Amino acid sequence: MTYKRVLLKLSGEALMGEKPYGIDPAIVQSIAEDVSKVVGNNIQLAIVVGGGNIFRGLKGSADGMDRATADYVGMLATVMNAISLQDGLERVGVATRVQTAIEMQEIAEPYIRRRAMRHLEKGRVVVFGGGCGNPFFTTDTTAALRAAEINAEVVMKATKVDGVYNCDPNKFQDAKKYTNLSYQQVLSDEIAVMDSTAIALCKDNNIPIMVFDIFKKGNISKAVAGEAIGSLIS
């Protein structure tokens, strides 16, 4: 099954590559090239990008910042990533619009649902920055929210690992990978793939979640084509 309208969730860490901080232009270019192949097949693609490669609100809060303030700083970090991703996409010929939940009219469009959907219908990629515009909500929750709003058929969470495991595969050799699992299993077992609000939103709106490795070339195209390359939550 090939999906026709997809919400791709990119973590900020995915844009770091092997760097300890910031944005790796080579990784952005690689992601942009993969996305260009997907859009070239008449797939409508929206992207929500995180900001953890620059600033993470929870970490700032743990270090003594006011939580709401820290989250707003994190939202600004996601806008930096969104603009960088737009640049990479446009350099490979993909028409792209950035929409932000917090208005920044000099650098991006404000988030307007109908305008976003119109961009998708015209074959443009829409990158959502600024989270959902409110503190205390993760960019995973933003991805679930935007997916429901634009009627996406699936949320694709691109990560550093090749699926969902019962424990950290980088720390435990006997970690078990799930091919398919239910929303309820993720919630009940507190599997750390997305926060519970994001999972519940997808569950309530019957939006499946595919988790896969972003660093393997061509995986975005394979995921959109419905290939079993990671883990599917439904």
Swiss-Prot record:
GO cellular component: a single term: cytoplasm
InterPro entries (alphabetical): AceGlu_kinase-like_sf, Asp/Glu/Uridylate_kinase, Uridylate_kinase, Uridylate_kinase_bac
Keyword terms, alphabetized: ATP-binding, Cytoplasm, Kinase, Nucleotide-binding, Pyrimidine biosynthesis, Transferase
GO terms classed as biological process: 'de novo' CTP biosynthetic process; UDP biosynthetic process
EC class name: transferase
EC numbers, comma separated: 2.7.4.22
Pathway(s) this gene product operates in, as recorded in its UniProt entry: Pyrimidine metabolism; CTP biosynthesis via de novo pathway; UDP from UMP (UMPK route): step 1/1
Keyword Transport recorded: no
Residue sites binding UMP per the record: G51, D71, C132, G133, N134, P135, F136, F137, T138, T139
Task performed by this protein: Catalyzes the reversible phosphorylation of UMP to UDP.
PANTHER family from the UniProt entry: URIDYLATE KINASE (PTHR42833), URIDYLATE KINASE PUMPKIN, CHLOROPLASTIC (PTHR42833:SF4)
Subunit structure: Homohexamer.
Family classification: Belongs to the UMP kinase family.
Name assigned to this protein: Uridylate kinase
Organism: Prochlorococcus marinus (strain MIT 9312)
